[in-house]
Amino acid sequence: MAAVIKKVGVIGAGQMGNGIAHVAALAGFDVVLNDVSADRLKSGMATINGNLARQVSKKVVTEEAKTKALSRIVAAEKLDDLADCDLVIETAVEKEEVKRKIFHELCAVLKPEAIVASDTSSISITRLAAATDRPERFIGIHFMNPVPLMELVELIRGIATDDATFEASKEFVAKLGKQVAVSEDFPAFIVNRILLPMINEAIYTLYEGVGNVEAIDAAMKLGAHHPMGPLELADFIGLDTCLSIMQVLHEGLADSKYRPCPLLVKYVEAGWLGRKTQRGFYDYRGAKPVPTR
């Protein structure tokens, strides 16, 4: 029998975390949004408020629904505040050692029957589950960015994930109004296994001088009908995240076709991470984005 999920914890108040809190609260779940940084919590709550206000202005949700959703979210700086959650979703930086540390500390305070999930975009669910005291109640729930707008959620079972956890997680995602894509536990799952090598190839195309930033993005938008060019999309995702996923693919599948482009590595080393640092393949510090190469 699938567990009943009523209260959801979200670890990390950044772009993914506040997005998950937003859709969960709007769907009627009580939410505890956790972050060790008070500033990030404040910023995350402000983002949720702003995004809900935008949905009201577009008549996607009512003012009443917005007010109720905000009333369901509690901001918390301590993991102890997640103790009675039925499901906790981790959205920390895409570094395995960071996630494992969070899970170790979380499981020390979380009720035994609760489900633990990771929003990881590439890391093995089986390995992450091994850092917990409940591998059978551990699962990957990978949302797409931006969470309030994107309809797909990847659901990934680890080797020990039991049927009750899978069914409860699947039901939770359905209540959010999202479509489930079930993926096996292989590096980067489905979406990023396909998407990130394309982005990496676009970066190689720039690195090798085949085309400049504008030409590459225009080629894919106008020639392949993509809504965003691959370099623009890389900046949106975050170049550090792109690099982490390519490294997981390269190490996990041992195939040279997944080798991260040296230019991607150089940008990350320079701290040019895309939109979040105002510089990446585009410079966002002016009135409109300008290609950096």
From Swiss-Prot:
Pathway: Lipid metabolism; butanoate metabolism. Keywords: Fatty acid metabolism, Lipid metabolism, NADP, Oxidoreductase. This is 3-hydroxybutyryl-CoA dehydrogenase. InterPro entries: 3-OHacyl-CoA_DH, 3-OHacyl-CoA_DH_CS, 3-OHacyl-CoA_DH_NAD-bd, 3HC_DH_C, 6-PGluconate_DH-like_C_sf, 6PGD_dom2, NAD(P)-bd_dom_sf. One of its GO terms (molecular function) is NAD+ binding. Its EC number is 1.1.1.157. It catalyses: (3S)-3-hydroxybutanoyl-CoA + NADP(+) = acetoacetyl-CoA + NADPH + H(+). Belongs to the 3-hydroxyacyl-CoA dehydrogenase family. It comes from Bradyrhizobium diazoefficiens (strain JCM 10833 / BCRC 13528 / IAM 13628 / NBRC 14792 / USDA 110). SUPFAM superfamilies: 6-phosphogluconate dehydrogenase C-terminal domain-like (SSF48179), NAD(P)-binding Rossmann-fold domains (SSF51735). It comes from the Bacteria. It is an enzyme of class 1 (oxidoreductase). The record marks H142 as: Important for catalytic activity. PROSITE patterns: 3HCDH (PS00067). One of its GO terms (biological process) is butyrate metabolic process.
